[in-house]
């Protein structure tokens, strides 16, 4: 599976030393297990946007100290570290409404929640299903662990640590049939009227879940760097919901400075942050920024993740990582609600991850979605030119298209529908008035050919709107 260290390029500590320290701690604490293959110099250099010399220097030091073994012409592998081996101290441990469209289903649907159905490795998934049936058949007569099957929670704890820098134990993880189910569980542990800060704009389904549970939802404004800390101190919510890795719907990536400011606010005010990392696997430019949870030394972040984008939306499997302070009340609700995902699906997914099939699938998806992403941007620039502005183009499976001609959201979506293209509105994501007209364009479920054709159709559909102003 992918291993993504975080390097602070503003630090006085040399980059090779930061990289060396990261791998040393991960191997020492068995979070990277014996025999795990480390990323190649070229891959890690590209991922972190540093020179291969930096990677090589770190790997050579790790090899010299016995943390890594080098196999010529093959790569570097984690070595076994003897108990008592000196180590550094560990870190703290403890769908959008459719737009207006015509009655007949349109040929091209730019839904932001769709994935490419041709990419899913059904044969590998079938093997994991059969294996889980054979291995755990004796346990399927019960409803399973209310918190989720331990085997899956163990694998999730491992991969989020390596890929997103998340610090957690399997006991902090709760499995649920979608993010909204997990938020419902969270709401049951809160008093009605609890003040929830919600990024403005934000994912309206999550907001409506809070509202349905009688929470006091308060919009918190953002800028290009993310949620505004001054607004948080002024509004003083108990919980703050945010999507820092790919802000929904605008698509900005919260800066490391702003992440640190949010964590400082939470620590100072004894508040909590809900980090919804809904498609953190897909990033197309820039060096990786670790999750808020991974940067947090104080246990103030509730982390939400999902397999809807990385596997299949129909699997309906998400997870919530809860800080120790909140575990008891949330666990009580888990016992009340029971588990909403079948034990069979959970155990099959655990095997799918353990055998490396999930990481192979992610790698393939990243490669193909990167190509689709490039095709989409090129088609927009070629066909729509300076009539639109592309927002949120560095990660995720959707972009925001800001209209630079004065048509309304409704007019733009209806014109597209009249030409066989479905677009999605942004206005439901705002609590207050939208500052500009824009539409959501998802591309994960479309072929490159359909992406090009869809944008060509948009050019034709919007031509009368553009020329009339």
From Swiss-Prot:
The keyword DNA-binding applies. The keyword Transferase applies. The modification N6-(pyridoxal phosphate)lysine is found at residue 309. GO terms for molecular function: DNA binding; DNA-binding transcription factor activity; pyridoxal phosphate binding; transaminase activity. Its cofactor is pyridoxal 5'-phosphate. The lineage of its organism: Bacteria, Bacillati, Bacillota, Bacilli, Bacillales. This is Uncharacterized HTH-type transcriptional regulator YhdI. CDD domains: AAT_like (cd00609), WHTH_GntR (cd07377). In the C-terminal section; belongs to the class-I pyridoxal-phosphate-dependent aminotransferase family. Keywords: Aminotransferase, DNA-binding, Pyridoxal phosphate, Transcription, Transcription regulation, Transferase. GO terms for biological process: biosynthetic process. PANTHER family: HTH-TYPE TRANSCRIPTIONAL REGULATORY PROTEIN GABR.
């Amino acid at each position: 599976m992918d291993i993504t260290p975080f390097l602070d390029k503003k630090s006085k500590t040399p980059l090779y030393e930061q990289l060396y320290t990261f791998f040393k701690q991960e191997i020492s604490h068995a979070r990277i297990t014996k025999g795990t293959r480390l990323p190649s110099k070229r891959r890690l250099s590209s991922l972190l946007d540093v020179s291969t010399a930096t990677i090589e220097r770190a790997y050579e030091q790790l090899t010299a100290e016995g943390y890594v073994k080098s196999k010529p012409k093959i790569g570097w592998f984690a070595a076994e570290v003897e108990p008592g081996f000196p180590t550094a101290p560990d870190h703290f441990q403890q769908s959008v409404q459719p737009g207006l469209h015509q009655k007949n289903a349109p040929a091209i649907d730019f839904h932001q929640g769709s994935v490419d159905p041709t990419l899913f490795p059904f044969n590998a998934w079938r093997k994991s299903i059969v294996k889980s049936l054979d291995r755990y058949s004796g346990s399927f007569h019960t409803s399973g662990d209310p918190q989720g099957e331990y085997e899956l929670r163990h694998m999730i704890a491992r991969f989020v640590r390596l890929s997103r820098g998340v610090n957690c134990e399997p006991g902090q993880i709760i499995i649920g049939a979608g993010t909204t189910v997990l938020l419902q569980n969270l709401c049951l542990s809160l008093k009605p009227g609890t003040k929830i800060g919600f990024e403005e704009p934000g994912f309206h389904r999550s907001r409506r879940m809070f509202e349905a549970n009688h929470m006091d939802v308060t919009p918190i404004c953002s800028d290009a760097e993310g949620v505004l800390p001054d607004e948080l101190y002024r509004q003083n919510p108990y919980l703050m919901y945010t999507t820092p890795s790919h802000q929904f719907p605008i698509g900005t990536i919260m800066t490391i400075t702003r992440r640190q400011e949010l964590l400082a606010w939470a620590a100072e005010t004894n508040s909590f942050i809900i980090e919804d990392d809904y498609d953190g696997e897909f990033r197309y430019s820039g060096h990786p920024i670790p999750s808020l949870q991974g940067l947090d030394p104080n246990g103030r972040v509730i982390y939400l993740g999902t397999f809807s984008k990385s596997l299949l939306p129909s699997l309906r499997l998400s997870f919530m990582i809860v800080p120790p302070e909140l575990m008891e009340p949330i666990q009580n609700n888990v016992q009340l609600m029971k588990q909403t995902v079948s034990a069979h699906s959970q155990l099959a997914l655990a095997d799918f991850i353990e055998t490396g099939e999930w990481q192979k699938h992610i790698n393939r998806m990243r490669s193909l979605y990167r190509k689709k992403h490039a095709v989409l941007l090129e088609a927009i620039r070629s066909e729509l030119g300076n009539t639109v502005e592309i927002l949120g183009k560095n990660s995720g499976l959707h972009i925001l298209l800001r209209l630079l001609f004065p048509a309304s959201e409704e007019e733009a979506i209806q014109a597209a529908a009249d030409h066989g293209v479905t677009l999605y509105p942004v206005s439901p994501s705002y609590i207050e008035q939208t500052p500009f007209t824009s539409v959501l364009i998802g591309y994960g479920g479309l072929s490159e050919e359909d992406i090009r054709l869809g944008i060509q159709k948009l050019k034709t559909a919007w031509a009368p709107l553009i020329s009339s102003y």
